[in-house]
């Protein structure tokens, strides 16, 4: 069973390493380059015209890697895995439309705010509704109407509030990754770490599944998660695909993921969190995305209330650029912060299991 995880990760890595330069040539030939805002850091002006919509590469690589791992190992796809992939692809489609309009109209704003929000809501609602269907033999659906941290806890919120909660998570994570994607490799590297964490979480939940309670040494701490191993397969495919894409996306970037990629990655993170019953834990596992999002909230709130800005520029990474930090220095230090968030998050995940011994 574990071979699926290995195959999906390796195939995802290979496909983006080999496929991304082909996409770069195609986008460059069509003139699909990034528009750079004039009010941003001066160093970014040299990036104008760099091919964007690179998220196409790792979206396709992830989907192909997932299904190839199934063909090679003989296992069938699960509803949980397909739902996460569908959420990723749907959010990626919204981002693609946004990127395409930016390129065609040669402006930094693509879809109108209402249209972009409507697209994300349609995809998010479809995911949330379907995630409460398809119960397995143990009665577990891909998602649960109970809130979760390292697993479900006692608060049942019902299907309507769950849909609202799921929408909040999807929008928050998607736009969090989108805001983080402002420096070469920053969002890609950070996302790779979080998907690595979810690969581990999926494997651990599979090994400690309540479906195998009779063979567990600590059955009281088992996990009621549908298809945990398949969630690990999806996470591994995403980790490998992002890692391969990082080769081309790191400074100086040969391609940007665009909203196509950032919305897709955020959707995948939210989907994995919801289906693995780690909805609140993802705020720590993806701590860098939360931190950068909060910097924008603080900046906007402060300016509207007091007329003053807290940071030289938001999102946070640009504040440090304007303080004189090089782009690479900001990226590496923010990666370190993200790595620490993942370590602490996984530590809490394990502690939640160990506390039930």
Swiss-Prot record:
The keyword Protein transport does not apply. Its EC number is 2.7.8.13. Its main location: membrane. It is found in: Cell membrane. It catalyses: UDP-N-acetyl-alpha-D-muramoyl-L-alanyl-gamma-D-glutamyl-meso-2,6-diaminopimeloyl-D-alanyl-D-alanine + di-trans,octa-cis-undecaprenyl phosphate = di-trans,octa-cis-undecaprenyl diphospho-N-acetyl-alpha-D-muramoyl-L-alanyl-D-glutamyl-meso-2,6-diaminopimeloyl-D-alanyl-D-alanine + UMP. It comes from the Bacteria. Belongs to the glycosyltransferase 4 family. MraY subfamily. This is Phospho-N-acetylmuramoyl-pentapeptide-transferase. The lineage of its organism: Bacteria, Bacillati, Actinomycetota, Actinomycetes, Kitasatosporales. The gene is mraY.
